[in-house]
């Protein structure tokens, strides 16, 4: 699973996802890509599941680039804990994704192989996505 090696602070505010993605919204490595159409937090497990699905489907052909990185810690309180007594401890990491953001890129394969592999990755994502070609 992806996570930062070290961070400046252990915990972060939740924040809000306004607007569309101004960075990472163009294909820059491969020829085919998966683009987000909705705002969401995508966990490191979901990113890894999508990457594995694409890799298995492509079978030694082509190259895959993961364009998002989970750099936001999500904290959880233990079950049946009373209110108060501070913020919970970091449990998992998420990538903040806005509409227009490229999630995965693929190159070195034919379009139908890329379409099939990327649709498998899309099914692992918690948001609506679209397949795009550069």
From Swiss-Prot:
<dbReference type="GO" id="GO:0032543">
    <property type="term" value="P:mitochondrial translation"/>
</dbReference>
<keyword id="KW-0687">Ribonucleoprotein</keyword>
<dbReference type="InterPro" id="IPR016180">
    <property type="entry name" value="Ribosomal_uL16_dom"/>
</dbReference>
<protein>
    <recommendedName>
        <fullName>Large ribosomal subunit protein uL16c</fullName>
    </recommendedName>
</protein>
<keyword id="KW-0689">Ribosomal protein</keyword>
<keyword id="KW-0150">Chloroplast</keyword>
<dbReference type="GO" id="GO:0019843">
    <property type="term" value="F:rRNA binding"/>
</dbReference>
<comment type="subunit">
    <text>Part of the 50S ribosomal subunit.</text>
</comment>
<dbReference type="InterPro" id="IPR047873">
    <property type="entry name" value="Ribosomal_uL16"/>
</dbReference>
<dbReference type="GO" id="GO:0003735">
    <property type="term" value="F:structural constituent of ribosome"/>
</dbReference>
<dbReference type="InterPro" id="IPR000114">
    <property type="entry name" value="Ribosomal_uL16_bact-type"/>
</dbReference>
<dbReference type="InterPro" id="IPR020798">
    <property type="entry name" value="Ribosomal_uL16_CS"/>
</dbReference>
<feature type="region of interest" description="Disordered">
    <location>
        <begin position="1"/>
        <end position="21"/>
    </location>
</feature>
<comment type="similarity">
    <text>Belongs to the universal ribosomal protein uL16 family.</text>
</comment>
<dbReference type="InterPro" id="IPR036920">
    <property type="entry name" value="Ribosomal_uL16_sf"/>
</dbReference>
<feature type="compositionally biased region" description="Basic residues">
    <location>
        <begin position="1"/>
        <end position="17"/>
    </location>
</feature>
<keyword id="KW-0934">Plastid</keyword>
<dbReference type="GO" id="GO:0009507">
    <property type="term" value="C:chloroplast"/>
</dbReference>
<dbReference type="Pfam" id="PF00252">
    <property type="entry name" value="Ribosomal_L16"/>
</dbReference>
<dbReference type="GO" id="GO:0005762">
    <property type="term" value="C:mitochondrial large ribosomal subunit"/>
</dbReference>
